[in-house]
């Protein structure tokens, strides 16, 4: 499969996109009950949302790492996701970017975007990247109060897939379905997506 180097792949509907986060039960359980994030979740901190289920599994170790033992599938509006991307800045400047302009945008933007190697179920790095979106300030407020349409605890499914993986099974059919996420040209340019381009020669895996 020829996957573009930087492409958003996600589960989505006509109106929502699913992103993943992992937390301690003290945060996850009240969030699931309230269908929104409530204290002890801290609005003041940057929070990272991840459309890639397998990258989330890499980050949380299949829900085994301290503070990340509950995995939540968070459905947010596609309009909200578009707002986040539109108001984002890459965590690192692109080659050829004016450094001063990038620093100015970084300071002004409430959203950070970074592209990390996508992972296999066994955490091996793949030769293409998945997006991580960091929300702070006004973006966190919008995320918490406007964008979220549902929160589902998928930890049980995570454990089931992990058990199958450890038993040596092919878990492909057990994973959440994902497909390329459509991005308008301007948004793709803002976040550095490469929907039709090969892997840039100057970047490593």
Functional labels for PLM-detected ranges:
Residues 1-43:
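ADP-ribose/NAD+-binding catalytic cleft of ART/PARP-like enzymes
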Residues 6-19, 92-94, 125-126, 132-133, ...:
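Partner-binding and oligomerization surfaces adjacent to conserved cores of proteins
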Residues 24, 76-78, 115-117, 135-137:
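Short, structured patches in soluble enzyme cores that scaffold and shape functional sites
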Residues 25, 55, 79-81, 120, ...:
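Short, solvent-exposed loop/turn segments at secondary-structure junctions
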Residues 28-31, 57-59, 84-85, 123, ...:
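Short helix/loop capping segments that flank catalytic or ligand/cofactor-binding pockets
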Residues 69, 111, 119-122, 133:
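Catalytic-core elements of nucleic-acid end-processing and repair enzymes
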Residues 131-205:
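Glycine-rich, aromatic-bearing surface loops/beta-hairpins
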């Amino acid at each position: 499969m020829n996957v573009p180097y930087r492409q958003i792949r996600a589960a989505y509907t006509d109106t929502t996109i699913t992103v993943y986060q992992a937390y301690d039960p003290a945060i996850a359980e009240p969030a699931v009950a309230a269908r929104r994030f409530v204290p002890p979740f801290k609005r003041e901190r940057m929070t990272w949302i991840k459309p890639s289920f397998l990258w989330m599994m890499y980050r949380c170790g299949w829900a085994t790492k301290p503070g990340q033992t509950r995995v939540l599938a968070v459905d947010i509006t596609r309009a909200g996701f578009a707002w986040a991307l539109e108001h984002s800045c890459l965590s690192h400047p692109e080659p050829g970017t004016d450094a001063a302009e990038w620093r100015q945008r970084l300071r002004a933007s409430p959203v950070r975007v970074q592209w990390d190697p996508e992972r296999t179920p066994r955490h091996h790095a793949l030769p293409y990247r998945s997006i991580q979106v960091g929300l702070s300030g006004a973006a966190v407020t919008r995320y918490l109060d406007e964008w979220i349409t549902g929160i589902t605890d998928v930890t049980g499914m995570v454990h089931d897939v992990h058990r199958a993986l450890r038993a040596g099974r092919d878990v492909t059919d057990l994973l959440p379905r994902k497909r390329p996420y459509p991005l308008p040209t301007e948004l793709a340019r803002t976040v550095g997506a490469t929907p039709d381009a090969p892997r840039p020669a100057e970047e490593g895996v």
